[in-house]
Amino acid sequence: MAQVDVFKKLVSHCKEYGFVFPSSDIYDGLGAVYDYGQMGVELKNNIKKYWWDSMVLLHENIVGIDSAIFMHPTIWKASGHVDAFNDPLIDNKDSKKRYRADVLIEDQLAKYDDKINKEVAKAAKRFGESFDEAQFRSTNGRVLEHQSKRDALHTRFAKALNDNNLEELRQIIIDEEIVCPISGTKNWTEVRQFNLMFSTEMGSTADGSMKIYLRPETAQGIFVNYLNVQKTGRMKVPFGIAQIGKAFRNEIVARQFIFRMREFEQMEMQFFVKPGTELDWFKKWKEIRLKWHKALGFGDASYRYHDHDKLAHYANAATDIEFLMPFGFKEVEGIHSRTNFDLSQHEKFSGKSIKYFDPELNESYTPYVIETSIGVDRMFLSIMSAAYCEEQLENGESRVVLKLPAALAPVKLAVMPLVKKDGLPEKAREIMDNLKFHFHCQYDEKDSIGKRYRRQDAIGTPYCITVDHQTLEDNCVTLRNRDTMQQERVAISELNNIIADKVSITSLLKTLQ
């Protein structure tokens, strides 16, 4: 099945089973804004707990804060967001659709990659075990031609970004004959910059109002509080501050479901280090963060690093961890060496010293910062897209199953009486009342046991237990595994011991040590 069809089915599945709803749905929705349903909020909370515990519990020198969404407007002037937080946009005159110029060119680069990979795949199939991929890539004429065009485009694109040359970005689109996905034409406007921050007014008109912004990132709330945290927590460099919170960007080209939204949630950690050590720490955090992603069990091939062609104004090194979504490799986390830009700017604009005094060196300095930043919603989408499976069973039936990591699943255990009589519901309720203190359980007695299994498969429940007539005699239940569908008879008294470790976030965290 084509990946685009899989993605459409996933979006439909998210709504049907209570993971994600279009916001304001009864009013025909609001563009690029979504609500998380009863299953989605549980999965999202589990993702956040996995991240938070991996940062704050596993690292003695990382603590958390929760800063306000509204902040003094000068903060955004100091950070560069007022002047430089822009996207290069281009319109197609025929479809009237607006696109990010850089994304159109990145998609063109991806097409060259696809052409090369198709040539490699065909050759691998033709030559079998004797196939030498490295030699083929370096000698095959078609591959070399595609690679040459890609390299030339990449070089030209990177230079245009670094020079902030909007005319050159448009010329690249024209020269590459990039067409509008809607109209299929090459009738493009000029490229222009668009600021992404939402603004509003604080205060009454009578008293004189102040223009403020909805924060476009959570990082600045950490920077302006870093010295408060350092002093009250008696923290020593290197140390980190973690935060989870909402951010807002007026994305003109919001697309791909919850991948790019106007209201979204971030998990960010700013790690403060001694100047001169930042690139070593940058490398270390790259490795730590990739290991965190891979621990979810979706396979090494699903991840890759992508170094930035153009560095942000605050960075001296930056990379993305990309995940293979149904629509290609896309960023789920950014790791940046932000230098001392933010702290120096806030010191300059506030007129207050926020230098750190290092007792070991007996000197004061402005720390450098390594940032790790995840979009919670993108992380949610990557997990859902990797977990979504349509399976054909041996008996000719089919099932849709979410093979979510057990520790992240919204519901850990479903408790089901075989029938709604003969004391089985009462026994099932008794079991659930004991287990619900340990993990999230769901009681289900409606429809046949087969239909109930399918419902639990569809929301990713790792385990189901069935209470039958024999249970009343031997105090044992049937335990079913979601992924294998295998069943075993286990004692009720052993259920917590058998299940708890497999579904706890603690077990996931232990793999990171």
What is the predicted function of each stretch?
Residues M1-Q513:
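NTP/phosphate- and nucleic-acid-binding module
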